[in-house]
């Protein structure tokens, strides 16, 4: 079973529907026993890093996720969920992340040309940096759907692919049993489903 971690943030039901479409048994849950018993974890998320991080901390899910990841349980972060896998974010001040991946999360407006619209919303092609299980069923140049105003920086150790939007925007990351997508695979059509399938296998 795949546990979609419910901490009050994220497009949970759309994600579960996508997993169901590829024949994956997934449950939306905040129950620690179910999370511990799951084969793999997905950490979704939309909104502000600071608020989401606080909600994870309020019910102790942050410590559980860190412990399970360190034990080797596979975990995928999606959008804000991916950002929280890193060490810190500078959204509305400085907030500590889960620290499962090296890097930090910074504002796009501090790095991109003024003529580029923020938030970054739309379809962009993936450019591969290295091999990854996430790439198993997709090819370089496939398009995925982004909605975000912040992005990961200093994540060379885990970087799998990037999108071009004024500069190279990290799109997928993977290091050991921890991986993530800055884009929304559940909104990215067949390509997104293939990425979810690769993670869930």
Question: In which residue ranges do the predicted regions lie?
Answer:
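C-terminal and late-domain segments of enzyme folds
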Residues: 151-201
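Pocket-forming structural segment of enzyme catalytic cores
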Residues: 88-165
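Cysteine-nucleophile active-site neighborhood
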Residues: 49-120
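Short gly/ser/thr-rich secondary-structure transition/capping motifs
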Residues: 21-28, 56-59, 125-130, 162-164
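Structural motif
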Residues: 42-44
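Short acidic low-complexity segments
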Residues: 26-37
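N-terminal beta1-alpha1 ligand-phosphate binding loop
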Residues: 2-23, 183-187
């Amino acid at each position: 079973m795949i546990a979609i971690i419910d901490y009050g943030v994220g497009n949970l039901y759309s994600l579960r529907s996508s997993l169901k479409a590829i024949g994956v048994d997934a449950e939306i849950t905040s129950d620690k026993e179910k999370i511990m018993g799951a084969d793999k974890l997905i950490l979704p998320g939309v909104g502000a890093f600071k608020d989401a991080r606080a909600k994870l901390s309020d019910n102790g899910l942050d410590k559980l996720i860190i412990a399970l990841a360190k034990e080797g349980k596979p975990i995928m972060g999606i959008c804000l969920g991916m950002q929280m896998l890193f060490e810190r974010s500078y959204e509305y001040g400085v907030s500590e992340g889960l620290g499962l991946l090296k890097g930090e999360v910074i504002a796009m407006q501090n790095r991109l040309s003024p003529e580029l619209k923020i938030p970054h919303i739309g379809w962009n092609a993936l450019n591969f940096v290295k091999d990854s299980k996430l790439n198993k069923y997709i090819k370089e140049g496939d398009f995925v759907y982004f909605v975000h105003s912040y992005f990961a920086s200093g994540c060379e150790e885990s970087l799998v692919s990037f999108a071009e939007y004024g500069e190279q925007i990290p799109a997928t990351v993977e290091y050991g049993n921890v991986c993530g997508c800055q884009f929304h695979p559940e909104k990215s059509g067949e390509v997104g489903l293939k990425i979810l399938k690769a993670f869930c296998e």
